Amino acid sequence: MSGLSESAKLVKDALERRGLETPMQPNLATPAEKKEKIEQHMREILNLLGLDLTDDSLEETPQRIAKMYVDEIFSGLDYANFPKITVIENKMKVSEMVKVKDITLTSTCEHHLVTIDGTAAVAYIPRGKIIGLSKINRIVRFFAQRPQVQERMTQQILVALQTLLESDDVAVTIDATHYCVKSRGVMDATSVTTTTALGGIFKSNPATRAEFLHGLR
């Protein structure tokens, strides 16, 4: 962890202490080594499925998938990619709720490795610190860019912001369509899953909780 930013270390440690970290094992492979191995194995999988990898439409597919996994949709497994966070002193004495909603979220179901597609809303009550608004979106994206279950992802975003803001007063909700439900199994194309994680005053004060949740309608 020596190469990680202080923010990344704090968030990772907080999630591990709470048992909320994504199940991972130590991996010292470089990104290039990971891509090489994934490409090899993906080539084997596609061959087993009977696809002709000499066809010009398919010949680069194993390489494309390897690059996509490491650099894009699973990049959140590597805390070296944790966003640079700007947290500043609340000199303006802002004390009312700050809420960002309709944050676009695309993740991957860890059970079937298919898409989770939805939106997130995040709110916090400023105390001693405030955070740059775009950083909230970037934190959501970081935790979305890994194999996930929605319940855990919601909690991870909550704990990350609580840790960085040094305040429990954070709320997170996610509405998402799961393609493991939509494109296979029950084949339900219209259902949406909602998960919510509340901390501090959002959990203890019904009026604050209602202000957050009702403002999402």
Curated annotation (Swiss-Prot):
Catalytic activity entry: GTP + H2O = 7,8-dihydroneopterin 3'-triphosphate + formate + H(+)
Class of this enzyme: hydrolase
Annotated pathway: Cofactor biosynthesis; 7,8-dihydroneopterin triphosphate biosynthesis; 7,8-dihydroneopterin triphosphate from GTP: step 1/1
Gene3D superfamilies per UniProt: 1.10.286.10, 3.30.1130.10
One Gene Ontology cellular component annotation held by this UniProt entry: cytoplasm
Pfam families, alphabetized: GTP_cyclohydroI (PF01227)
Entry similarity comment: Belongs to the GTP cyclohydrolase I family.
Subunit organization: Toroid-shaped homodecamer, composed of two pentamers of five dimers.
Name the record gives this protein: GTP cyclohydrolase 1
Species of provenance: Vibrio cholerae serotype O1 (strain ATCC 39315 / El Tor Inaba N16961)
